[in-house]
Amino acid sequence: MLVAANLRPAVVSVAPLVDEIMADLGFGSALAGMLTALPVLFFGLSAPFAPKLAARFGIERTVFGALIVLIAGMGLRFVPDVACLFVGSAVIGAAIGVCNVVLPALVKRDFAHRSGLMTGLYSMTLSGGAAVAAGLTVPIDQRLGGDWQVTLVSWGLLAVLALFVWIPQLSTTHRVVASGPSGSLLRNPIAWAITVFMGSQSLVFYTFSAWLPQYLLDDGRSAAQAGVILATGQAMALVAGLVIPIVAGRWADQRLVTLAVISLCAAGFVGLLSTDHLTTLWVMLVMFGPGASISLALLFMVLRSPSTAVTGQVSGMAQSIGYVVAAVGPILIGGLHDLSGSWSFAMGALGLALIPQGVAALWAARDVKMVL
């Protein structure tokens, strides 16, 4: 779980500082969106290699190596060079992308009989790391005198801790069957439904998390207030990520629960765009959606797969394609804001991602296992 706690802070911590980074480096919204999108893009680009790495070195050593790469990527952000900032973000994304794929396979292997609970705990830890990063990044930055580079690198201390705690796991090596998605998997409608579901919820989560602080700053709030609201939303995602998969796991068919989650997220977007009041509530509802949905996506991978090997393959497929699609979000929404001058238009466009997510849920949440 300490490893899972490291899979979001390096990404989420950029958003509360994006205004400071833009001012310091002279970025526009589109380029800043590219900076926030780069790790998500490399989540997807590195995902197909994760099953092969786990087959070659074992899950335990693969995670250990990914943590080393994560720490190296965060260190690159300290180098006073714009190129290193972007390269470091890409390296961070590649490391996290590998862990994103192999950890659900670990849940399938070791906790198949408690998949709902363990998926919820895993997702809660992901969201918890994001919430802590969202809430503490600005106070850390202020304590460090407004040095955003040092602030970003400081989150590497958590990764160093996880690295040392993981060392005892290296005494055992569990290899999984190699390969990425097979041809039959690529033709399987359930696998594609999980992929679309994963991509849609990731698009909403990372794009909303990336631009919410700037949206709030432009609305007249301070950086500290924006950080608190984002952290509150992330905390709601944490609760949703823990509770919803446990509830959904009680039924063989998860369609009703999943559509209810998507509806709450849609209500949050409507409220945020239609009134200036109750902003924190609307943010909480929006973040409830992807917070629960990432848990549901991981649960679908476990429940719909006939074996640990297939879980790893589905995870690799869903995350490689899904995260590449999601990476477009921060850039697209930043560009739409620059073109229209309106956050309402840009955020409204983001809310449309809930439509394909809802359609995909009708297939992914059914009580049917993949037949390959």
Model-found features: residue ranges?
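Residue-level signature of mid-helix packing/kink "hotspots" within the transmembrane helices
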Residues: V12, V40-P48, A131, Q234-L242, ...
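Extracytoplasmic gate region of multi-pass secondary transporters
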Residues: A15, P189-G241
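Conserved MFS/SLC helix-loop-helix module at the cytosolic interface between two early adjacent transmembrane helices
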Residues: L45-A83
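Helix-to-loop junctions at the C-terminal end of transmembrane segments
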Residues: S46-G58, A240-D253
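Helix-loop-helix hairpin linking two adjacent transmembrane segments in secondary transporters
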Residues: V82, H113-R114, G120-S171
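Cytoplasmic helix-loop-helix junction between adjacent transmembrane helices
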Residues: S89-M124
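C-terminal transmembrane helical hairpin of 12-TM major facilitator-type secondary transporters
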Residues: Q254-A297
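A late C-terminal transmembrane helix in Major Facilitator Superfamily
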Residues: T308-W343, L350
